[in-house]
């Protein structure tokens, strides 16, 4: 029994190291590669998915990161685990919507991007158990209770910096790029529709 308790107490540091040096890069790295694939195939063009698909990508990023933020801010209990699992399930549903949008668009989705999507789809389902291990012990309360973070301030800075640099900024850039292109396309369509009217007016004046 004593050896078992010692093994359980040693699990938490191992889970922390696995989260920081394996799980976090495994989530942010493919996410950044996915953004690069979108940029390379000009997702900002309306026919290539445009703003709608970019918003779906932002939603997926938030759904994947929500379990991490919840586990860092609140005590681990059945209610929190339910919320984290719900976020993971929501991520899967949004991923299915992303696939439907990609199939309808004209953008070429390479085999590399497809493999990246497959990897990202399963990420929340093994991140959630990892965060449960990282934030032991699990209480029996069914409420959200703030707790001291299981990670140090330095760890939190690494997580926040990584999420910002490899997640928030790239996908914000993608969304802004899509919105700008949508405005350009809208302005161009207005000008195109106005041109025939101007031509017909000139013809009547000439007559």
Q: How would you label these PLM feature ranges?
A:
Residues 2-21, 66-82, 130-157:
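Helix-coil boundary and interhelical linker segments in multi-pass alpha-helical membrane proteins
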Residues 28-37, 88-102, 162-178:
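Transmembrane alpha-helical segments that form the membrane-embedded catalytic/substrate-channel core
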Residues 32-52, 182:
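Membrane-interface helix-loop junction between the first two transmembrane segments
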Residues 37-40, 63-76, 94-105:
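Membrane-helix exit/interface motif
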Residues 45-58, 109-116:
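Juxtamembrane helix-capping/reentrant segments at transmembrane boundaries
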Residues 57-71, 119-129:
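Core segments of transmembrane alpha-helices
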Residues 78-148:
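Membrane-proximal helix-loop-helix units in multi-pass membrane proteins
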Residues 151-207:
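A hydrophobic membrane-anchoring alpha-helix module
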């Amino acid at each position: 029994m004593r050896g078992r308790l010692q093994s359980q107490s040693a699990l938490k540091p191992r889970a922390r190291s696995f989260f920081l040096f394996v799980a976090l890069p495994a989530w942010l790295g493919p996410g950044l590669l996915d953004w690069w694939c979108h940029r390379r195939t000009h997702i900002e063009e309306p026919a290539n998915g445009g703003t709608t698909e970019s918003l779906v990508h932002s939603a997926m990023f938030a759904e994947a990161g929500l379990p991490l933020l919840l586990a860092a801010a609140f005590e681990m209990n059945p209610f929190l685990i339910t919320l984290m699992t719900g976020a993971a399930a929501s991520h899967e549903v949004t991923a299915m919507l992303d696939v439907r949008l990609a199939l309808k668009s004209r953008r070429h989705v390479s085999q590399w991007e497809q493999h990246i999507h497959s990897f990202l789809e399963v990420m929340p389902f093994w991140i959630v158990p990892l965060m449960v291990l990282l934030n032991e012990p699990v209480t029996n309360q069914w409420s959200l209770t703030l707790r001291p973070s299981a990670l140090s301030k330095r760890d939190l800075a690494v997580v926040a910096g990584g999420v910002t640099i490899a997640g928030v900024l790239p996908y914000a850039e993608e969304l802004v790029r899509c919105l700008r292109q949508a405005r350009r396309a809208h302005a161009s369509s207005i000008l195109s529709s106005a041109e025939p009217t101007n031509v017909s007016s000139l013809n009547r004046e000439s007559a």
